[in-house]
């Protein structure tokens, strides 16, 4: 990530008057699977409110086959896809960009497994690159065949080296790679390291929790929260915050509460709400 690219993207969005805007999403896993859509929805919201959306053809090229991996949140997102008249292109993987010529090249995977090359011109292109683990991890004995640290998805203990535990984006469990996941993983690893050192009894387990605040328009967020297997796992009662619908409360949480929680709670180990869950007999 480069800190200068967010304001650069915002400048492109503000300056685009008409034409074709392409937004891309690479194959999983990536950091926050909803991030490519967040930029797209906020851009479209700006164009809509500035009276330019009708002159801009927005296309979303997704290497995957679905809009979002947890089906419960798709209906709310589809309403915004329709509102912004976004053209969804599934199974399209970006492979090349001709910047000066303003052309993007994709590999489209067909239903029968065959593929074809697709080229598209653009006035604006928002690229989310494919993501891999750092070389020092990929080339180490800690990595699995795909290059990620190979840990048990529940205990986060390395499958081969009993004195190694892992957390965060570099590990191979199927959870969403988000700060919300790391927030839940860190206390589990801390507990289980103490167990391995003989200083605490009772292993803790991670349930795959992840969260993705999908910014569908300025002032409203669809707050996706889920565990392993795409099971919806809300932190708030539905009468207070219905995560499957866009709400202003979720925006307020993202804009006002989460930054303070991150800097003064998560990073300093002071957040009691992330207390680890102890393993039951199924985990030994």
Please report, for each region that a protein language model flagged, where it lies by residue:
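Beta1-alpha1 glycine-rich phosphate/pyrophosphate-binding loop at the start
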Residues: 27-71, 276, 281-283
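A Rossmann-like FAD-binding core segment of flavoenzymes
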Residues: 48-146
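FAD-site-proximal beta/loop scaffold in flavoenzymes
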Residues: 1-17, 121-184, 195
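A conserved FAD-binding loop/helix module that cradles the flavin
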Residues: 167-216, 223-225
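FAD-binding beta-loop-beta segment adjacent to the flavin cofactor pocket
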Residues: 147-165, 216-236
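Glycine-rich dinucleotide-binding loop and its adjacent helix/turn
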Residues: 1-52, 153-154
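A structural signal for isolated positions on well-ordered beta-strands in alpha/beta enzyme cores
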Residues: 22, 57-59, 165
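C-terminal auxiliary extensions adjacent to catalytic cores
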Residues: 223-284
């Amino acid at each position: 990530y480069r800190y200068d690219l967010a304001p650069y993207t915002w400048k492109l969005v503000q300056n685009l008057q008409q034409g074709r805007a392409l937004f891309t999403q690479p194959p999983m896993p990536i950091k926050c699977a909803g991030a490519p859509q967040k930029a797209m929805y906020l851009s479209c919201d700006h164009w809509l409110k500035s009276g330019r959306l009708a002159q801009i053809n927005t296309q979303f090229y997704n290497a995957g086959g679905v809009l979002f991996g947890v089906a419960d949140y798709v209906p709310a997102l589809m309403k915004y896809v329709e509102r912004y008249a976004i053209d969804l292109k599934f199974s399209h993987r970006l492979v090349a960009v001709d910047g000066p010529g303003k052309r993007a090249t994709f590999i489209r995977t067909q239903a029968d497994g065959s593929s074809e090359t697709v080229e598209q011109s653009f006035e604006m292109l928002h690229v989310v690159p494919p993501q891999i683990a750092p070389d020092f991890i990929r080339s180490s004995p800690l990595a699995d065949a795909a290059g990620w640290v190979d840990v048990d998805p529940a205990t986060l203990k390395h499958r081969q080296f009993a004195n190694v535990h892992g957390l965060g984006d570099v590990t191979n469990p199927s959870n969403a790679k988000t700060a919300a996941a790391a927030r839940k993983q860190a206390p589990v690893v801390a507990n289980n390291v103490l167990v391995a050192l003989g200083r605490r009894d009772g292993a803790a387990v991670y349930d795959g929790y992840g969260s993705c605040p999908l910014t569908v328009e300025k002032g409203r967020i669809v707050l996706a929260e889920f565990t392993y297997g795409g099971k919806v796992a809300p932190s708030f009662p539905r009468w207070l915050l219905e995560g499957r619908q866009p709400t202003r409360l979720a925006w307020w949480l993202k804009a006002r509460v989460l930054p303070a929680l991150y800097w003064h709670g998560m990073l300093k180990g002071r957040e009691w709400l992330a207390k680890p869950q102890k393993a039951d007999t199924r985990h030994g």
